[in-house]
Amino acid sequence: MTNNQFSEDTKKIADQIKDSLIGISDNLVLESKEVEEIFEELSKNEEFDYEIERILAILNEQTMDLTQLQSRIILLIRKYLDKTKNLKLKMDEKLINKNVAEVSNYLMHQHSKIVRDANKNLAKPKDKLQSLTKQARMDLKRLIKSFAVYQVYMFMNPKRIAGETKLMNFAYNMIKGGMKLAKKYEGGKEKDIKSYSPRLIKKLEKAHAGFKKNNSISI
């Protein structure tokens, strides 16, 4: 990723790429057996489920208060970092706040998409969680759980996360400019590319093709 700041007229494109990368990251992390175990552990915890429901209630508000959403997610992370196995690392408050700010925006974007899809065939659609189907509500719940689990994973595996940061950098440049651009920056060395799964490379190639054609992401 270059160090140049984005101009206002390209900010929308950058946000689209960021949303896509978050989705890629979620998929990669949740394929890990270790993280699946943590996910299952938290899923069986009634208190954790209750906290998820409280976050869903915030997503239901028409104001979509970003500050409240961030506060709830940060509280959830702090609470369960202490309860999850093998956690001996000191929390990086700045890193947590930065990640939460970015992903809170992503969650709200996904919330709107799920609500829109769920209300597509209604005569008088309303942007309220109560009108969602059971599946849509489950999708929202899993989305938030996935984010919470990813934060726990970050603090359990700092070295692995460093590798994923390199991969994310490669993915960003791959989507924006294809393999030619991606090879010029961090994460694009031959040995790095060989370490990425063929399935991921295909997803990024598809995303790049969609980006070139429609100026949007299609993963």
UniProtKB/Swiss-Prot annotation:
Protein name as catalogued: Uncharacterized protein RP030
Pfam families per the UniProt record, alphabetical: DUF5394
Lineage, uppermost ranks: Bacteria, Pseudomonadati, Pseudomonadota, Alphaproteobacteria, Rickettsiales
Protein origin, superkingdom: Bacteria
